[in-house]
């Protein structure tokens, strides 16, 4: 029997999500791993499918910046859609067997997997033939509203991208766009339909089981990811703020970053951050938990090595004395725009943004 390995990742920056899809699809293509289902949430983001029209983004650049929403072009089907907190995004990365190699059937099966979950909460939903996605209300009805977007990509019967189910989503953000280019109908969420917020973990559990049922597969839960911390060391406030960047030694990549490190056995993220701060800079200063946890793939390994990282900030006096540890060969205090330009990973940039907000 086929198996589907389910990864429940929490928050994933969008560009990290694209990297995960690429790595898992390559791993599947090369026979290094089996089918996987990635379940996650993205920060506010607008994505453009292959059929997207730019005019379906109705918000100005200033409005997008205010909401912290970036725009990405993708190779999935469909028009423009929104991703954000409270929305469960699923990326099935399946190599379809010969008896399932039909694009329309695959889309119907994704829809059915979502519809079965909605039914568990008493929500009746279904497809509308002329529009993609999962809908509440009939075609042509004045109250027809989309509850889940579907946008997939298939290459040699290997699937990527997937679905976005509005669970506890802020529906006001859909006013930034014409969702999927459809002006005649609205959007909704499970929270709006039921009048209460739902535990995301319960919906994830139901989705994982539903996909395994629809795709005749046995469920396997992914092993826990490696756990790491990032620490933005900052001195000064506002426009005068300066961020400590350290350069990894050439044999460790040679790039600039904020402080990072792995959790050791028995450590909490805060304990690991305090230890890394002292080991890598000689500083012993109180930490601020940024309430920022996200997942990503470490490097380009196949199958991917998953990491879950917690972000912290440290505010130090102007005369703070930095003494580099063995992992780095240089450090600089730079302004925030320079730090954001130099940092190679979105998660590190987000740590700096939060630390200097």
From Swiss-Prot:
GO biological process: protein modification process
Residues covered by the BPL/LPL catalytic domain: 31-219
Cited InterPro entries: aa-tRNA-synth_II/BPL/LPL, BPL_LPL_catalytic, Nudix_hydrolase, NUDIX_hydrolase-like_dom_sf, NUDIX_hydrolase_CS, NUDIX_hydrolase_dom, Octanoyltransferase, Octanoyltransferase_CS
Keyword terms, alphabetized: Acyltransferase, Cytoplasm, Hydrolase, Multifunctional enzyme, Transferase
Annotated site residues (Lowers pKa of active site Cys) in this chain: 146
GO cellular component terms attached to this protein's record: cytoplasm
Keyword Calcium: no
Signal peptide interval: none
Every Nudix hydrolase domain range: 224-356
Catalytic activity, EC: 2.3.1.181
Binding residues for substrate: 76-83, 149-151, 162-164
GO molecular function (one): hydrolase activity
Annotated region described as LipB domain, given as residue ranges: 1-222
Motif (Nudix box): 261-282
Pathway assigned in UniProt: Protein modification; protein lipoylation via endogenous pathway; protein N(6)-(lipoyl)lysine from octanoyl-[acyl-carrier-protein]: step 1/2
Keyword Hydrolase: yes
Note: In the reaction, the free carboxyl group of octanoic acid is attached via an amide linkage to the epsilon-amino group of a specific lysine residue of lipoyl domains of lipoate-dependent enzymes.
Functional note: Catalyzes the transfer of endogenously produced octanoic acid from octanoyl-acyl-carrier-protein onto the lipoyl domains of lipoate-dependent enzymes. Lipoyl-ACP can also act as a substrate although octanoyl-ACP is likely to be the physiological substrate.
Name of the molecule in the record: Octanoyltransferase
Gene name tied to this protein: lipB
């Amino acid at each position: 029997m086929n198996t589907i390995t389910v990864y429940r990742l929490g928050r994933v920056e969008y560009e990290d999500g694209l990297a995960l899809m690429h790595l898992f699809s390559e791993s599947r293509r090369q026979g290094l791993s089996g089918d996987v289902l990635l379940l996650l949430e993205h920060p506010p983001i607008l994505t453009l499918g292959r059929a997207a029209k730019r005019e379906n983004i109705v918000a100005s650049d200033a409005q997008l910046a205010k909401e912290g929403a970036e725009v990405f072009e993708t190779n999935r089907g469909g028009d423009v859609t929104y991703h954000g907190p409270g929305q469960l995004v699923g990326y099935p990365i399946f190599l379809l067997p010969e008896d399932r190699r039909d694009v329309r059937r695959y889309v119907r099966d994704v829809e059915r997997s979502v519809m079965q979950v909605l039914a568990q909460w008493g929500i009746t939903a279904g497809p509308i033939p002329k529009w993609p996605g999962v809908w509440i209300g009939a075609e042509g009805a004045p109250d027809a509203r989309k509850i889940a977007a579907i946008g997939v990509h298939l290459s040699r019967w290997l699937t990527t991208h997937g679905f976005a189910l509005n669970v506890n989503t802020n529906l006001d953000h859909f006013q930034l766009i014409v969702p999927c280019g459809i002006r005649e109908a609205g959007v909704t969420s499970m929270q709006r339909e039921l009048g209460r917020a739902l535990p995301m973990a319960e919906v994830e559990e139901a989705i994982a089981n539903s996909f395994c049922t629809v795709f005749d597969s046995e469920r396997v839960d992914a092993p826990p990811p490696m756990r790491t911390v990032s620490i933005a060391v900052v001195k000064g406030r506002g426009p005068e703020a300066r961020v400590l960047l350290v350069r990894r030694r050439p044999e460790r990549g040679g790039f600039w970053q904020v402080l990072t490190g792995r959790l050791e056995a028995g450590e909490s993220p805060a304990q690991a951050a305090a230890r890394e701060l002292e080991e890598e800079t000689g500083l012993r200063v109180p930490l601020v938990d940024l309430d920022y946890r996200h997942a990503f793939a470490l490097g380009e390994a196949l199958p991917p090595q998953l990491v879950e990282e917690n972000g912290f900030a440290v505010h130090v006096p102007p005369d703070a004395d930095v003494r580099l540890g063995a992992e780095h060969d240089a450090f600089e205090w730079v302004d925030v725009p320079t730090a954001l330009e130099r940092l190679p990973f979105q998660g590190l940039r987000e740590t700096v943004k939060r630390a200097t907000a």
